[in-house]
């Protein structure tokens, strides 16, 4: 079970990512996926965020951009490719791991890739989606559209 302080930390980080996303014109959408989105995080759960961008490669090398996005000093831990998703993992001073998955807009395109569909079906809450691209993809998968608290 996750304590109240960890939940507040996650909410602060998600709010900071939202504030950053609305200022970056290449960001089309942001969503929380995984255990926090599904409502079943544990103390060892990481915070998984997917950032949908028009130019994902431009976001990758800029560590300052990522630190600004998460709103706290977060040390880089690793980078990994998961097919069309490029993951950057960071760790906060409290030990919370944040996985930022950066993808192109085509990641949400139809037909939806089986890996993408699994990620979205396993838990997805929209943080930022001004064009409705995430909501449209969730609808196409028969997944209920849910927004992170206060991010509608």
Which residues make up each language-model segment?
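Conserved NTP/Mg2+-binding pocket subregion across the NTase superfamily
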Residues: 1-6, 69-152
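Helical scaffold of the NTase/Pol beta-like nucleotidyltransferase catalytic core
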Residues: 1-31
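Short secondary-structure capping/turn segments at boundaries of alpha-helices and beta-strands
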Residues: 16-19, 33-38, 74-76, 85-88
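Generic detector of well-ordered alpha-helical segments enriched in charged/polar residues
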Residues: 11, 15, 64-67, 142, ...
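Catalytic metal-binding acidic patch
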Residues: 34-69, 95-97, 101
């Amino acid at each position: 079970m996750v304590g109240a302080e960890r939940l507040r930390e996650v909410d602060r980080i998600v709010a900071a990512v939202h504030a950053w996303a609305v200022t970056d014109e290449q960001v089309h959408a942001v969503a929380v996926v995984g255990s926090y989105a599904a409502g079943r995080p544990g103390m060892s759960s990481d915070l998984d965020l997917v950032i949908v961008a028009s130019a994902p490669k431009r976001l990758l090398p800029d560590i300052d951009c990522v630190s600004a996005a998460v709103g706290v000093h977060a040390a880089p831990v690793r980078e990994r490719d998961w097919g069309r998703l490029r993951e950057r993992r960071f760790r906060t001073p409290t030990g919370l791991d944040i996985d930022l998955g950066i993808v192109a807009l085509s990641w949400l395109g139809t037909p939806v890739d089986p890996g993408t569909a699994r990620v979205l079906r396993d838990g997805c809450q929209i943080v930022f989606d001004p064009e409705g691209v995430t909501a449209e993809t969730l609808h196409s998968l028969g997944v209920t559209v849910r927004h992170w608290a206060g991010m509608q």
